[in-house]
Amino acid sequence: MGAAGSKLEKALGDQFPEGERYFGFENFGNTCYCNSVLQALYFCAPFREQLLEHYANNKADAEENLLTCLADLFSQISSQKKKTGVIAPKRFVQRLKKQNELFRSYMHQDAHEFLNYLLNELVEILEKETQATKADNETSSSPEKIANVLKAPLANGVHKEPIVTWVHKIFQGILTNETRCLRCETVTARDETFLDLSLDIEQNSSITSCLKNFSSTETLHAEDKFFCDKCCSLQEAQKRMKIKKPPHILVIHLKRFKYMEQLGRYKKLSYRVVFPLELKLSNTVDEYVDIEYSLFAVVVHVGSGPNHGHYVSLVKSHNHWLFFDDESVEIIEESAVQTFFGSSQEYSSNTDHGYILLYESLGTR
């Protein structure tokens, strides 16, 4: 790897970003799903900053969990004396396998499932830490408060305010589900949070068209009728989903694995789906405001089927695009990103397809 590392340093020359580190990850037998996602998260600037800050403030008394193992790995990379090389994320992978049997086998795993699990696990750890800190602060002020603090959450069935962690602040958006009764025209809106958007895909489409389909109006009729509270009965209705609060980091998962009933198994959709380097989010509640996003990472699935294959990642760092394939790290041209859109033909020799896209908000325009 020394040679490959120095090759990358030579390629970047005096353009090598000050203080940045580019390290490949060792593969522990089919852990490419994990390596590719971790590289994407490492180059997600707000995530890396918050994780390292949290680690610096809490490492003395922290018991080991996925958060401490991930922070330890990121800290290890950022504090390397060398600019390039290989690191073994052994402690993190061991902890992951210890906690979740799904990732224990040497079978091919799903990168999106892993990302989803990891973000939710980090949220849970941070929420528990916040609750513990609150309880400590309240009980330390006066001993007689202890009994009240323990009873408080149960009293009168009071709804507790949800805890907003730094993971929420980075990745969480809000969707609003609007349903319009076609008899009385009453609109019912229900909000739900998301950490990523999973989009259905079609051949020769784009992220913009996939997002439009995601927010398209659907008519509920026959056995799918909607119970209208105003009419007090089941009625035909129109339903649509819009983005009420766009996240700072928008994670898009392209649903490339589809269950084929006639085959009785999943099939990979190699469809060509164009994802732009700059994305305007238009399916928002406020239709007059376009939110602009910039692509900074792509997790790519390599292979023709869902149960085998490989994951790699493309990452944008300081205006350079890098290609991470386990231990290997190479610089690539920005134009090379479009080779991962997918295939126009069903049977193609190109099996490297964008699977998870990470965009950072540039704000409103």
Swiss-Prot record:
SUPFAM superfamilies: Cysteine proteinases (SSF54001). It is found in: Nucleus. InterPro entries: Papain-like_cys_pep_sf, Peptidase_C19, Peptidase_C19_UCH, USP_CS, USP_dom. Keywords: Hydrolase, Lipoprotein, Myristate, Nucleus, Protease, Thiol protease, Ubl conjugation pathway. A lipid is attached at residue 2 (N-myristoyl glycine). Its main location: nucleus. GO terms for cellular component: nucleus. The active site is at residues 32, 310. One of its GO terms (biological process) is protein deubiquitination. It catalyses: Thiol-dependent hydrolysis of ester, thioester, amide, peptide and isopeptide bonds formed by the C-terminal Gly of ubiquitin (a 76-residue protein attached to proteins as an intracellular targeting signal). Recognizes and hydrolyzes the peptide bond at the C-terminal Gly of ubiquitin. Involved in the processing of poly-ubiquitin precursors as well as that of ubiquitinated proteins. Required for the correct development of pollen. This is Ubiquitin carboxyl-terminal hydrolase 4.
